[in-house]
């Protein structure tokens, strides 16, 4: 049942609980991808012709374009480089990037679709128990920075896989820096026993 629920949540392939011994599967919240349209772009012309585009060169040297399906935002640069953010899965990110490329083609530019690459996957989950961040920071000092007056979460820089985790006292976890989703899952399974070790005992 848990696996089915998780698969329904993910909206993609079914989840193998052998791979997720904690029984918790981080939800992908944001995918950042890049692609090279491989042609020079006139950003002013794009901003004038595309209805879902804004361009303020004094503020930022790229056209900001949005589409509703998949709900994403693209940053389009004069060099032909494009960054796509906001998708909830790798497939959606690629689909969105292709849609932006097609919009640029329809505006008369010879845009191609080269070197599509996932640059960052952001996932999150909730372990459903409070965590003693001071204790965790103390015993994992080499990987942790915890300065509650600056930021309420503990920042944990995992070496293998190379993932940054934000760990909150509430038990909410954010994982960032993955290039493939399995890195997100592995990082969470690595940290889970540590989190249970520093579980706050409710008085």
Swiss-Prot record:
It comes from Oryza sativa subsp. japonica. GO terms for cellular component: nucleus. Keywords: Activator, DNA-binding, Nucleus, Repeat, Transcription, Transcription regulation. InterPro entries: TBP, TBP_CS, TBP_dom_sf, TBP_eukaryotic. Belongs to the TFIID complex together with the TBP-associated factors (TAFs). Binds DNA as monomer. Interacts with RF2A and TFIIB. Interacts with CWZF7. GO terms for biological process: DNA-templated transcription initiation. It is found in: Nucleus. The gene is TBP2. Belongs to the TBP family. GO terms for molecular function: DNA binding; RNA polymerase II general transcription initiation factor activity. This is TATA-binding protein 2. General transcription factor that functions at the core of the DNA-binding multiprotein factor TFIID. Binding of TFIID to the TATA box is the initial transcriptional step of the pre-initiation complex (PIC), playing a role in the activation of eukaryotic genes transcribed by RNA polymerase II. It comes from the Eukaryota.
